[in-house]
Amino acid sequence: MAWARDEGGAAVLEILVQPRASRTRAVGEHDGRLKIQLAAPPVDGAANAALVEFLAAALGVRRADVELLRGETGRRKTVRVAGITAAAAVAALAS
């Protein structure tokens, strides 16, 4: 998938976030990125925290293993997930 790659022993994910959705879930690929709908609003970092929590739970890693590299204030985000490969991330999130 174009939205996931291996880099330095971790998976790097390109994500498009839609805050204030009815529920938190991954909805598929959009514009070369994984689109994730978040129930949290984009206020005071709530959406970023919800994204980290969702990814950690979906990928079976600790929240500390999920690091936001780019996009702290935007909808387009780049996230590094330690302890998992890009192929494993795609399998977990695309299902």
From Swiss-Prot:
Query: What's a single GO CC term here?
Result: cytoplasm
Give the transmembrane ranges.
none
Give the matching InterPro entries. DUF167, YggU-like_sf
Question: Per its UniProt entry, which superkingdom is the organism in?
Answer: Bacteria
Which residues lie in coiled coils?
none
Which Pfam families does the annotation name? DUF167 (PF02594)
Family statement: Belongs to the UPF0235 family.
User: What HAMAP family does this protein map onto?
Assistant: UPF0235
List, alphabetically, the NCBIfam families matched: DUF167 family protein
The protein here is known as UPF0235 protein A2cp1_1215
Organism encoding this protein: Anaeromyxobacter dehalogenans (strain 2CP-1 / ATCC BAA-258)
